[in-house]
């Protein structure tokens, strides 16, 4: 008789959704309540302020939407821009591609800088394009901070310097869905006008809560759209409705109550660990994963170390090996969920997510499972080599700075 239950637990190592801490799951086990009660602001008002901290902001305004990160992409574009407005965007992976596609479908004129997959946004090219835009027709620059399809992180600080060097007034929009809460993010210092996050990655929650940190400059741009016949349509994602309700602790429509309680607990987890320790932990886990990849004799999709992501590693399968089979075998045989290759890299890479609530032994389990699946699929890997390399690195590099 075939087994109908798999013992143990599924090992989730995709780059999102991520593992949810037990205490966060417990925090979300709440009874329904009146979201217009006099008590409700005691939950929400501190949330608006505390959420700013993971964005590296004291000056921004936080809006929380029942949505995914994709919805917040639309919120940023539709509130600040008008049909036909020109925006500059680099395309170097599936998610930068999808954001560009959304902008085009909304009626924006997107100037696309095509970059090789495995690299990221090039600040020098952005500066060049902005310098050439003498009439300041480009209204915004769109950049994906951490491209999970290829395991690449772009340098947003350098992008800001490029915009400033060009003397250009364009808004800066940054997709931080797979970086915020895991990698250093400095919305105020980098003068990010719309910083976008989702609940299901570094914030360690289920999907369903979209977060945006909006600068004063972006708020003014949104106000400037009022009354324009060519303004982009928006209703559900309209900031004005949020601005009227949020200061009193309420929302213009029913919020996802369990996710708000979960967000409060997830932020407490991050703050108790210390954000600098969170970032350091992700850096150590990312490098340990890359040590394992090198020991296997394989390469990452990231073309050079400067592009390495510390939340996900995309690993190139050897020539002639279908990465999809490695992923399927890992799931069926070892109950390990690895990330699939997307679009241009479909069947060419498998991805190990190392984002969220993880420690050394969590990661080593994923590396062991990936290693066994590689060997089972005929890849010539020395058994134990990746685990040994990663564990050696982890022993020498504690996850906490102090």
UniProtKB/Swiss-Prot annotation:
Protein name: Serine--glyoxylate aminotransferase
Coiled-coil stretches noted in the UniProt entry, renumbered to this chain: none
One Pfam family of this chain: Aminotran_5
Gene3D superfamilies: Aspartate Aminotransferase, domain 1, Type I PLP-dependent aspartate aminotransferase-like (Major domain)
Necessary cofactors: pyridoxal 5'-phosphate
Pathway: One-carbon metabolism; formaldehyde assimilation via serine pathway
CDD domains per the UniProt record, alphabetical: AGAT_like (cd06451)
Effect of inactivating the gene: Mutants cannot grow on Cl compounds (methanol, methylamine, and formate) but grow normally on C2 compounds (ethanol and ethylamine).
UniProt cross-references to InterPro entries, sorted A to Z: Aminotrans_V_dom (IPR000192), Aminotrans_V_PyrdxlP_BS (IPR020578), PyrdxlP-dep_Trfase (IPR015424), PyrdxlP-dep_Trfase_major (IPR015421), PyrdxlP-dep_Trfase_small (IPR015422), SP_NH2Trfase/AEP_transaminase (IPR024169)
The keyword Transferase is annotated on this UniProt entry: yes
Family: Belongs to the class-V pyridoxal-phosphate-dependent aminotransferase family.
GO BP term, pick one: glycine biosynthetic process, by transamination of glyoxylate
Record has Lipid biosynthesis as a keyword: no
EC number(s) reported in the record: 2.6.1.45
Keyword entries, A-Z: Aminotransferase, Pyridoxal phosphate, Transferase
Enzyme category, top tier: transferase
The reaction(s) this protein catalyses: glyoxylate + L-serine = 3-hydroxypyruvate + glycine
Entry-annotated residues carrying N6-(pyridoxal phosphate)lysine: 201
Species: Methylorubrum extorquens (strain ATCC 14718 / DSM 1338 / JCM 2805 / NCIMB 9133 / AM1)
